[in-house]
Regions:
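Beta-propeller fold detector
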Residues: 66-74, 112-118, 151-166, 311-320, ...
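Juxtamembrane interface at the cytosolic side of transmembrane helices
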Residues: 1, 184-241, 252, 428-456
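Short loop/turn segments that connect beta-strands within beta-propeller blades
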Residues: 61-65, 106-110, 146-150, 305-308, ...
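Hydrophobic alpha-helical segments
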Residues: 116-206
């Protein structure tokens, strides 16, 4: 399963149009009360409300009594309608930013793709507006457009003031595990390792099983099987152990060893380039009170007077889960509402005061777990029931969710992620967190003992 799911994850574009109904998945994966990322945010449009999240866009009004599918024009596949943000511009132009592209709503209420000049391996992380300017943030660049929004200028954010170029140790290990650290060639090498591990697994089982079925056939096949199993295993032992160890480090408890680490970029890798913000940008928003831009990255928050200025790290760094921000809105003055899996907080930038949205107390330090009491996946201020945050697990109770939305499809790529990380095995309960740790040790044991047996 690791090998097959890994191959799918290494080539997401090949499988982006393949979905599976949640009907066939464990009940925890079914949507309930807009949970599991179904509702990330809302946007007022004319006299109605547009809801968006990881399964597209939906149309309703401030009462949310009737929910209508509003996804006409998006490419086939849930992966292609994972909406990061939605903006209604002056003049009623509406833009939706999916992970893989920007779309504009035409007069026939159909979403049309807009080419912003984004690289093939880049992903959109946010969309915002400042006056009549449209700003799209990818994970590596900022794209700026003015009316009629047909041409975008690419901005490379300058290196931060007085900060050395460092990259995430976690992301480096992750990309080494997938091969992405060295581009297409690296991914193909890892694909080969996946196929090798698949062969070693199957041949190992057959070597044990065949003699118990038909002794004659088993005896004839076993020498050849044993020979190739040993040859392939010996030649690729270093690579298979590397893939095993790096995967082992990407899940708890080993994850805690690397999750906050920073290292120099690996020479000649994809992160070793002139853009120090490669795969680090998450959002940029204009603060009308302080007259500057608030830049959020995987390294924290920075401020810039102009988008072309040198970013300055803010003196106060609000608590944000390592999974990143899901909510970033201004409320009054220079108050910012920031939501992530660490919780929902209000940050007044001028004073530096941060308070919990629900308890009005200061942020509490949590040891180990990146999850707070409230696992915030979204927020909406547009319904008559009042403003509310959306909990990833519990959802939102203030607006009803149509029953038929519970089994909306999940992309094959996302299922592969859940399978690859062990989260899909919900019958393990809390033990699923340790699944990779235990299985990883088991695989290492098999590789080590196989090497020992081969020497005899």
């Amino acid at each position: 399963m690791f090998c097959v799911s890994g191959l799918i994850l290494n080539h997401p574009s090949l499988f982006s149009k393949i979905d599976v109904s949640r009907r066939w998945l464990p009940s925890a994966y079914r949507y309930n009360n807009w949970n599991n990322g179904l509702l990330r945010g809302t946007e007022k449009w004319r006299a109605q409300v547009l809801l968006y999240g990881n399964n597209g866009v939906w149309l309703t009004d401030s009462t949310a009594k009737h929910i209508t599918d509003f996804n006409k024009g998006f490419p086939q596949g849930v992966d292609n309608r994972n909406i990061r943000g939605l903006i209604s511009m002056p003049g009623n132009a509406v833009f939706a930013a999916s992970t893989y592209g920007l779309y504009r709503l035409d007069p026939q209420l159909t979403w049309q793709y807009v080419d912003i000049g984004m690289a093939e391996n880049d992903k959109i992380s946010d969309i915002t507006t400042c006056g009549d300017s449209l700003i799209v943030t990818s994970r590596s660049y900022i794209f700026l457009a003015l009316p009629p929004y047909t041409s975008f200028k690419t901005l490379v954010v300058k290196p931060a003031y007085n900060e050395p170029h460092r990259v995430s140790l976690f992301r480096t290990v992750w990309w080494l595990h997938s091969g992405q650290l060295f581009g297409l060639l690296g991914r193909l090498v890892v694909d080969g390792v996946a196929l090798i591990l698949l062969f070693l697994s199957i041949s190992g089982v057959l070597y044990w099983f065949l003699p118990h079925i038909r002794k004659g056939a088993g005896k004839r096949l076993m020498p050849h099987l044993f020979l190739w199993h040993n040859k392939v295993g010996r030649l690729t032992l270093g690579l298979t152990i590397l893939i095993c160890v790096t995967g082992w480090l990407l899940r708890p408890p080993a994850l805690l060893l690397i999750v906050y680490g920073k290292i120099p970029p690996v020479p000649f890798s994809t992160v070793d380039n002139d853009n120090v913000w490669y795969d680090k940008l998450r959002s940029v928003r204009y603060d009308a009170t302080l007259n500057d831009w608030l830049l959020y990255t995987s390294d924290g928050f920075y401020s810039l007077r102009q988008l072309t200025d040198i970013p300055q790290r803010t003196a106060v760094q609000p608590p944000v889960s390592v999974m990143g921000l899901n909510v970033q809105q201004t409320t009054q003055g220079d108050f910012w509402l920031l939501g992530s899996f660490s919780g929902l907080y209000v940050w007044q930038r001028s004073s530096g005061i941060i308070s919990d949205y629900y308890t009005f107390q200061g942020p509490q330090k949590t040891e180990g777990s990146p999850l707070g009491t409230h696992i915030v996946a979204g927020y909406s201020p547009h319904f008559i029931g009042g403003k509310f945050g959306v909990d990833y697990n519990k959802g939102a109770l203030l607006i009803p969710m149509p029953r038929e939305m519970a089994i909306l499809p999940m992309s094959l790529r996302q299922i592969a992620i859940e399978l690859h990380t062990g989260r899909l095995y919900t019958f393990l309960g809390s033990g699923s967190v340790l699944y990779i740790f235990i299985i990883g040790l088991g695989i290492l044991w098999c590789l080590w003992t196989g090497k020992k047996i081969m020497k005899k």
